[in-house]
Amino acid sequence: LLIMSKSYIIDSVRSPIAMKNSDMLGFRSDDLSACIIKGLLDRNSNMNKDDIEDLVTGCAFPEGPQGMLMARSISILADLPLSTGGKVVNRFCGSSMDSVHQVSQAIVAGDIKAGIASGVEDMFTVPMGGFVPDFNERLNEKEFYIGMGETAENLAKELDISREDQEDFSILSHKKALDAIDNNKFDNEIIP
């Protein structure tokens, strides 16, 4: 008989979204992530950091300053116990979501009692494709390397979404985000 635990998301926070030449430029991903985790723990004082057994970090380009098992570095910089594990998940755009899944699965399976799922990407430090891209040309025969733009075009055609509909959606999305910023709707989720 196997009794499964339940997992819960008790809080979520993030960094501000940065633009090129913004104030965020120059911050290391691991330092910023550690700052966010410290902020998360500070606002959840009922959470004992000694109970956190794993940190799973999603990262599409875990190389350069985002390499060397960055989750472990973040864990140490965030003053989590040395016993807290760390691993990096790379599923490109789905990396952070997969980190949430993996922490939840570990809790449900009884492997850990508490964990932190996170994600990080510094698009200004690591060039698109990585530092030394070495794509297997044979995969081009199978249409494996399709960029996001081409994927979007294929989906728009398949789902009959016009360019005008896409632009209207984008404008509405930006208006909603600006309205949320103006009305302080994001204040509780952004650290620092």
Task: Please give the residue ranges for each predicted region.
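Conserved "HGTGT" condensation-loop signature of ketosynthase/thiolase-family condensing enzymes
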Residues: 2-84, 118-192
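Alpha-helical membrane segments and immediately flanking helix-loop junctions
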Residues: 92
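Hydrophobic alpha-helical hairpins/lids featuring a short glycine-rich hinge
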Residues: 99-130
